[in-house]
Structures are given as structure tokens and as C-alpha cells.
Amino acid sequence: MAVIYKTTAHASAGREGVVQTVDGFTVSLAFPKPGATHQDKNNPEQLFASAYAGCFSQAVRVVLQQHQLQLATQPIVGVSVELHDQDGLFHIKAGVELAITGVDQTTAQTVITAAHAMCPFSRLIKPENFLGLTLNGAKL
């Protein structure tokens, strides 16, 4: 397996600190507040959801290209990330939703399933921490 990209991030002060990558990305962190819809700082769950959504969206694009499908509207990927506390041990669970138009249900299901198999983030999540796939609002 050949490395095609590598970066390193450094963090200090935990969830109340700062994360910086060696290539210039910097973000201030804050612990997520239950019920808060907007904070001036981000949390690791938001960053994970954003990265996973971007990665899965790229996997969808690749699958569409492989099947020679051109859509009038770009599919939208949503990733939900939940932070769970089980006896003081935190767990992250994640699920993926795809909104796609311009193809039939069978093709859409093929796209989301193939993208899930291809996406590095999907392969990273253990089955017990995966909340599942949702296609156009329907859980698969």
C-alpha cells in the first residue's frame, strides 16, 4: 500500500485546547454543550463528522463515475456523529445519510452501498459503532 498523503496534528489542553496540523490547519476546541446549536469553538465530533462527510461524498462521486452516471444535481451526504458515555468510557458512533435524485432506488442503493465499502472512514468505524446507512430518508 502506497502512502498518497500524510499529515500530523498536534493538540494541547484536551477538549478546551487547540489542534494544529503541520500543514497549517488550526482549530480551537470546546467540549460540546448539550442542546447547544452554535458555539464559537468546535469539538472533535464536529471535525470527525465533517471529515467523514467529505470523504464519503468523494466515494459517492467515484462510484457514480465508475457506473458512468451523470446527475443534474449533486448528491448530498450527511454524517451524524454521536458521543456516548458508558460508565465513564466515551464512544463515538456514526451514521451516513445520502440524498440522491435522478436515479432509481436500486441504483441509488448500489451507489450508497459501494461508497460505504470504498470510503476509508466507513472502513475505520467498527460495526458496533456504525449507526447505519440512510438513503433518501429511509434507513437501509
Swiss-Prot record:
GO terms, biological process: response to oxidative stress
Membrane-spanning parts: none
Short name of any one Pfam family annotated for the protein: OsmC
Paired cysteines (S-S): none
The family this protein is said to belong to: Belongs to the OsmC/Ohr family.
Name recorded for this polypeptide: Organic hydroperoxide resistance protein-like
